[in-house]
């Protein structure tokens, strides 16, 4: 079937200096506040700020080399090679551990819990970037992406809703207080919410972002393995190891959507460039390796003492 280029392959709106003061954290929470006539609607100023924020992050992403293929005809093979490399890397990791090597990520249980809090702003909007596609539910090219979104929501089954699963994980281990984290904790989550609210203007970037996000990274099975070692439920992470596969899972659906949306008539080169830029957008902000490396034992101890002091200050008799 011959498809025309999506109508929103045109260049994104340039940013306005008046809206550059919005930090990732403040914008993140602003985009979570629904205001308007329908579900998921935000006020006009926040929408404008989100668009300019996204433009800035895409310019940052354009400087990153994420190995996106120069020929989309090789996309499936390149992604399969990446998946195979992850599998080999994980097997090598397991061999190292069985030979007596220490954990690669988490030095102790507190380190792991710190990680859960650090990545919470991202995990609690899992799949949100696909929200903006719902109005295009009749477009068969986007049907696989909408299917991914519904699966992220658990297809209406609460125990399978990814955001709910992560909320329950945080509550179970006393990690609910993630809202006071620094601005960099919120960058990737803000990117995902901004894509959700600007899907029309940034459709190629959204498709590329989804492609990158649904690949299976090496850090995911390692994280699950080490959480389990520390007696922390790894189910949220093992679930994603299962569904983000290159055979029949989200990674395969994401790749197929890129190929289906590739314009047969129109500027295919520009579409390719913008999809690649969206793919690289996954690497903007704090990812798992940076979140793991950000742990400081002394700082974490100070945080715990300060929190407990605030609660118990008026409860001592001496």
Predicted region positions:
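Non-heme di-metal
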Residues: 1-318
């Amino acid at each position: 079937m011959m498809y025309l280029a999506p109508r929103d392959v045109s260049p994104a709106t340039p940013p306005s200096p008046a809206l550059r003061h919005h930090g990732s954290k403040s914008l993140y929470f602003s985009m979570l506040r629904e205001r308007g006539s329908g579900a998921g609607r935000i006020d006009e100023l926040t929408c404008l700020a989100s668009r300019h924020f996204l433009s800035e992050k895409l310019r940052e992403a354009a400087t990153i080399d994420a190995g996106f293929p120069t020929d989309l005809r090789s996309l499936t093979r390149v992604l399969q090679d990446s998946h195979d490399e992850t599998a080999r890397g994980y097997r090598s990791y397991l061999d190292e551990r069985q030979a007596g090597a220490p954990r690669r990520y988490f030095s102790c249980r507190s380190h792991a819990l710190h990680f859960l809090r650090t990545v919470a702003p991202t995990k609690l909007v899992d799949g949100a970037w696909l929200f903006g596609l719902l109005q295009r539910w009749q477009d068969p090219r986007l049907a696989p992406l909408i299917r991914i979104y519904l699966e992220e929501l658990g297809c209406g089954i609460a125990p399978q809703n990814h955001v709910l699963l992560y909320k329950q994980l945080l509550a179970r281990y006393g990690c609910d207080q993630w809202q006071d984290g620094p601005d960099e904790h919120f960058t990737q989550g803000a990117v995902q919410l901004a894509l959700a609210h600007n899907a029309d203007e940034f459709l190629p970037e959204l498709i590329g972002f989804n492609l990158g996000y649904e690949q299976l990274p090496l850090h995911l099975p390692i994280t699950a393995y080490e959480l389990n070692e520390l007696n922390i439920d790894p189910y949220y992470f093992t679930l994603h190891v299962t569904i983000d596969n290159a055979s029949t899972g989200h990674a395969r659906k994401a790749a197929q959507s890129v190929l289906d949306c590739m314009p047969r008539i129109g500027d295919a080169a520009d579409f390719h460039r913008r999809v690649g830029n969206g793919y690289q957008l996954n690497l903007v902000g704090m990812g798992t390796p940076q979140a793991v490396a950000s742990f400081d034992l002394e700082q974490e101890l100070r945080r715990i003492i300060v929190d407990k002091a605030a609660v118990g200050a008026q409860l001592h008799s001496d």
